[in-house]
């Protein structure tokens, strides 16, 4: 059953490719120039070419037929192709019969065939060919009435009966007319089939639109036609034909530089129409998806394909190529200029793929560094991929500077490549810190601050580079050629890569500064209080040799509570808000009210405390979230069962503000 479904899926794509190729040919065909050539040739007196408007209408009819063939259901499409194959077989039978009659006329032998070996060979060959044609037609049309397709065997039967050659010519014409009448009868009996199909399709479309809407109809057609795979196969067929036509006319092998130029020019030739450009877009998307999938497989093996929600990657690269092609008018350029521009666009796509590879590798590498996994092979794969992502973007930027004149798009490529290398450098630095901490007996103090400073340095460099790109783009727009699309790209780049990043970075800095001030304002627990409390930190589940006390009388490690406050300003246990006393109205400089001496030291909550890295603070990025992982907080975790002991004392309602005295 699976094999049948796969075969149907292959047929669903393969049978629709010719319709897109026909659309592509009709787009390339210039009817006006075609008729100008006809007027200058000897075909001008042909009645078929006297009616130009009829040919123009036939041009549009070709578009309609192509769209109909593209959207036909698979069952009807298969049936249509079977009818077409049957027509080809009948034409082949007609050709076999005509060639046989012509050969007999040239030989002028009218005697018994068994007395003439050449005549016998011709008869045997023609008979076998006609039998094969009749059998295939019967199988394709699924009928046992084989005589319907055997009219072209009449000249063979007449020759076997020693009929004169002049009469055999007449019999051959009769067989041709009989077969033509059969075809006309079949077409006439199915004349209303297209109308009925269109009527039923219209009724079904109206029902779907009324019930589900136009968006659901579009998604259904997209999935049924398998549009991405269909256009990718169409473009690959065009590209293969282009390569074949080149090598079939060349006798000498091409050099390496010539092969690279051939590759670019072939791609440029295969994106000269909107249909072929869409094919290139989907092909690039699938190539990017394949590269990113191989990247995950290299890092994680078969575990990469288990519950992977990000298998829709690759569309970013395809959309990028489409936007750049439309913005630069790619399909309107000459082949050489198109190949040059396409090389720049492909560089941008490669830079985007490298950035996506880094997005995949970054959390995996950091998680591997923070874990206790001793597998050298896993560490080798992670580090080798990071080294590749460190060296290759820098090499690509160097080659671009060597061979191209600098402009706005090349600056975007170079800046993206440099930022990718810098981000990989930061990832490797944090990975080395994790590995150093792994071999130490005690955790490294202020590790989260080091990670934050590393990420902050990278984010600052990224912000500066984005700002430089915007400044260069604005200057080029003002003093160079101004376009609406270019201005929109600069505006979008400024909003997402400059303004939003600046906001997130500043917000992250304020959160960390506020968390540090709050920790400094909390009292430090004495040794007597720790012995009396006799509990573990409710965040990292480790024994407390030093701790700070919240206004709600909860004990935490200062570092653990600081990480928690990076995310939210509530107590991890009772969830009351921790604010400075100066921020609360009516409190003035009075000391904050403290619970009674016998108040509970820990409160059993219905919800367990969330880890401090449960929600990544804005602007810190993936690396900081990985650095603040539970492996860093807890390097030999105790049992979670002792996280909180039930105690007696007043409950603090959730959401109540707990003032924190200013230091």
Curated annotation (Swiss-Prot):
Membrane topology: Multi-pass membrane protein
Name the UniProt record assigns to this protein: RING finger protein 145
Lineage of producing organism: Eukaryota, Metazoa, Chordata, Craniata, Vertebrata
Biased composition (Polar residues): 619-628
Key word Repressor present: no
Conditions for induction: By high-cholesterol diet.
Localization, UniProt: Endoplasmic reticulum membrane
Zinc fingers classed as RING-type: ranges: 537-575
Function: E3 ubiquitin ligase that catalyzes the direct transfer of ubiquitin from E2 ubiquitin-conjugating enzyme to a specific substrate. In response to bacterial infection, negatively regulates the phagocyte oxidative burst by controlling the turnover of the NADPH oxidase complex subunits. Promotes monoubiquitination of CYBA and 'Lys-48'-linked polyubiquitination and degradation of CYBB NADPH oxidase catalytic subunits, both essential for the generation of antimicrobial reactive oxygen species. Involved in the maintenance of cholesterol homeostasis.
Bilayer-crossing regions: 53-73, 77-97, 123-143, 146-166, 168-188, 205-222, 225-245, 275-295, 316-336, 340-360, 384-404, 410-430, 460-480, 482-502
Originating species: Mus musculus (Mouse)
Pfam families (alphabetical): TRC8_N, zf-RING_2
Main location, first listed in the record: endoplasmic reticulum
Catalysed conversion reaction: S-ubiquitinyl-[E2 ubiquitin-conjugating enzyme]-L-cysteine + [acceptor protein]-L-lysine = [E2 ubiquitin-conjugating enzyme]-L-cysteine + N(6)-ubiquitinyl-[acceptor protein]-L-lysine
GN (gene name): Rnf145
Statement: the UniProt record of this protein carries the keyword Nucleotide-binding: no
